[in-house]
Design a protein with these regions (language model features):
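A short beta-to-alpha transition loop/helix N-cap that caps and shapes the active-site region
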Residues: 142, 158-163, 299-304
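Short, low-complexity cationic-aromatic patches
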Residues: 76-78, 94-106, 138-145, 215, ...
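A short, N-terminal "cap"/entry segment at the start of jelly-roll beta-barrel domains
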Residues: 2-80, 160-225, 307-309, 313
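C-terminal functional regions that serve as terminal interaction/effector modules
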Residues: 2-46, 236, 243-313
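Conserved metal-binding segment of the jelly-roll/cupin
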Residues: 91, 124-146, 151-156, 264-285, ...
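Conserved short histidine dyad/triad with adjacent acidic residue
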Residues: 64-74, 84-101, 208-213, 223-240
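Extended, compositionally biased flexible segments
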Residues: 52-86, 95-119, 127
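A short beta-strand-loop-beta hairpin characteristic of the jelly-roll/cupin
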Residues: 91, 95-129, 243-267, 305
Length: 313
């Protein structure tokens, strides 16, 4: 009791350091750590930067990660906390081993043609194709008569975060899927022959597979959409809790607004939209625009945390 007769307040539990077992009787007990409701929820993580990545210059060959791991504070390559985007550029007539430590990786062929070979399946690919590869250690890419440029997004950071490994082929939740440019154009023609409602966010082609059709995803956690914008239009501002990685496929005088910042498109640029950021896409040009978007949306749909909302009418 103080001189004035009042009782001293106990220290705030938020100021307690991390606690250990007082007298552990085993190695398992010694590994226990304890926090409290005053200090357990004040972990400060770096924000996900909104950033644009350019494709590799002509004549530069190899795998080019769109890596923000330093800004994100993680010790593995990552574009967003759970996704990694990359470019792969190959010289004509060369081959590249491509191990994939992911549940699945989405690919888009920007230029050139070649052959993809896995352990049990393979196919020829050409510019404009989309394909999905389940995680595996033994893929090989072969470029044919011209240089090849590909864009890919997978969930490698998600597996690295939990030190996980791709499932064995018989247990994998996804299969190899190949969507040719011709089939994609057929699907676009069908979409543009139909009407839309006020609640539809533009005209976009959503990719899925036989195994993931019920969820409308391409992998359990990744969604892929091929969005379009007519000339002199914009996609209404909106937000969602998934992060988004966008490839600018087609369009002149196009830009995105992300958290109030104008992000001009350049050919084949990769744009990062942070989770929760208000954003919109704009086409001020005279021709239609197209852009591919990969999100970790499957994860949020499953967790009921997508939080999608339009921010304008």
């Amino acid at each position: 009791m103080s001189a004035s007769g009042s009782v001293a307040e106990p220290p705030d539990m938020a100021d307690l350091p991390m606690q250990h077992a007082q007298a552990p009787a085993s190695a398992a007990q010694s590994r226990a750590r304890f926090f409290n409701s005053g200090n357990a929820f004040n972990v400060k993580l770096p924000v996900v930067p909104a950033r644009a990545f350019a494709p590799p210059a002509a004549g530069c060959y190899g795998v080019f990660d769109c890596d923000q791991s330093a800004a994100l504070g993680c010790d593995f390559p990552a574009t967003t906390p759970l996704m990694l985007a990359r470019y792969v550029q190959m010289a004509a007539g060369t081959s590249l081993a491509m191990p994939l430590r992911a549940t699945g990786v989405v690919w888009y062929v920007i230029a050139g043609d070649g052959h993809l070979q896995g352990a049990s399946e393979g196919f020829d690919f050409a510019a404009g194709d989309v394909f999905l590869l389940p995680g595996a250690p033994d893929y090989r890419l072969d470029a044919k008569g011209a240089d090849v440029l590909l864009w890919a997004v997978g969930n490698e950071p998600q597996l690295a975060f939990e030190q996980g490994r791709p499932a064995a082929p018989d247990d994998a939740p996804v299969d190899l899927v190949h969507c040719t440019a011709e089939e994609i154009e057929r699907q676009f023609a069908l979409i543009f022959s139909m009407g839309t409602s006020d609640e539809t966010s533009g005209r976009a082609l959503i990719f899925s597979s036989e195994r993931q059709a019920a969820a409308r995803n391409l992998t359990p956690t990744l969604t892929l959409s091929f969005n379009t914008l007519e000339p002199h239009t914009h996609q209404r501002a909106h937000r969602h809790n998934s992060a988004a990685i966008t490839l600018a496929v087609q369009g002149t005088r196009c830009h995105s607004m992300v958290d109030g910042v104008r992000c001009p498109w350049t050919p084949w640029a990769t744009l990062v939209t942070p989770p929760g950021a208000p954003h919109s896409h704009h086409n001020e040009g005279e021709a239609g625009a197209r852009f591919l978007i990969v999100q970790d949306g499957g994860l949020h749909y499953h967790a009921r945390t997508m939080g999608f909302e339009f921010l304008e009418r």
